């Protein structure tokens, strides 16, 4: 099995801290599929920012052509932006995926695009992307694995200045029960995370970050508990005294309701609430 991409290193801990929380928003997500082999997918989302009152939404239509290894996705959002993503998998080489990602804003007349490469090998994962512009920014990363140990590096090169804009290094170890991840960005930002699956229905994680010249280390703790098949409870707290709690209840196999809140123990006026509905009839 190929190692994860550089961006997905430490993903278990990241998901524990980020997924399942929607405080500050009212959200509705829907996913439906059509076709004999479910090769067409319609995904829509709408959100209302409680604080600013801003409404937003997007619609994605994905069509798969498995015999040619092609996936075509058309996107639209309420910012009046149109996107097209073409993925070609294992047609140019084993384990190689080539993606063309483009975005067009008709009201502004602006176009942008990227060509992405993802090469997955049994013990290595190499990714790269380059902007389709006159002076593109090039991102490249590689991850190598052996016996559960992972080491990775990433760099960003700005062709307009002919300089490295950013560099990152990462090191970690992953098992089905534990994931340890550490990283350094531009030799100034240091961080680490630990994820542990305590039981089949209990997960815990921690994150630690420190910046050269900063006031001290930032840290956070998170947990996820599923007392039943229909209910999942999440909680997290960080060094800024922010506490978040969320609960997801499966009203039916196709419909999930999520309630979440965040409050600051050091400030009485920083409370946030959120509600989300997720509909997926394929579940």
Swiss-Prot record:
Q: Which UniProt keywords apply?
A: Ion transport, Membrane, Mitochondrion, Mitochondrion outer membrane, Porin, Transmembrane, Transmembrane beta strand, Transport
Give any GO molecular function from the UniProt entry.
Answer: porin activity
Q: What happens when the gene is disrupted?
A: RNAi-mediated knockdown results in a hyper-connected mitochondrial network in body wall muscle cells.
Give the UniProt entry's GO cellular component terms: mitochondrial outer membrane; mitochondrion; pore complex
Q: Which GO terms describe its biological process?
A: mitochondrion organization; olfactory behavior
**Key word Methyltransferase present:** no
Superkingdom field: Eukaryota
What is the predominant subcellular site recorded for this chain? Answer: mitochondrion
Its signal peptide is: none
Report the sequence similarity comment from the record: Belongs to the eukaryotic mitochondrial porin family.
- Write out the domain note: Consists mainly of membrane-spanning sided beta-sheets.
What this chain does, per the entry, is described as: Forms a channel through the cell membrane that allows diffusion of small hydrophilic molecules. Plays a role in maintaining mitochondrial morphology.
Tell me the protein's name. Answer: Probable voltage-dependent anion-selective channel
- What lineage, starting at the top, does this entry show? Eukaryota, Metazoa, Ecdysozoa, Nematoda, Chromadorea
């Amino acid at each position: 099995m190929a190692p994860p991409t550089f961006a997905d290193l430490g993903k278990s801990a990241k998901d524990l801290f980020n997924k399942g929380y929607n405080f500050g928003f009212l959200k509705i997500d829907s996913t439906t599929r059509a076709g004999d082999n479910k090769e067409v997918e319609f995904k829509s989302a709408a959100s209302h920012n409680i604080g600013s009152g801003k409404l937003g939404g997007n619609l994605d239509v994905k069509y798969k052509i498995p015999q040619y290894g092609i996936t075509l996705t058309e996107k639209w959002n309420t910012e009046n932006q149109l996107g097209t993503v073409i993925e070609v998998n294992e047609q140019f080489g084993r384990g190689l995926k080539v993606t063309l990602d483009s975005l067009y804003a008709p009201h502004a007349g602006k176009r942008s695009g990227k060509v992405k490469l993802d090469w997955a090998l049994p013990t290595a994962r190499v990714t790269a992307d380059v902007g389709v512009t006159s002076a593109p920014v090039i991102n490249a990363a590689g991850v190598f694995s052996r016996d559960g140990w992972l080491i990775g590096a990433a760099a960003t090169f700005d062709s307009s200045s002919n300089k490295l804009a950013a560099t990152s290094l990462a090191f970690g170890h992953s098992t089905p029960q534990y994931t340890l991840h550490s990283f350094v960005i531009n030799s100034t930002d240091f961080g680490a995370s630990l994820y542990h699956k305590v039981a089949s229905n209990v997960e815990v994680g921690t994150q630690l970050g420190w910046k050269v010249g900063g006031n001290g280390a930032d840290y956070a703790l998170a947990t996820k508990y599923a007392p039943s098949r229909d209910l999942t409870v999440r909680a997290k707290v960080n060094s800024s005294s922010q506490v978040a709690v969320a609960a997801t209840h499966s009203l039916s196999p196709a419909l999930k309701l999520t309630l979440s809140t965040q409050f600051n123990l050091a400030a009485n006026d920083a409370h946030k609430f959120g509600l989300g509905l997720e509909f997926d009839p394929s579940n």
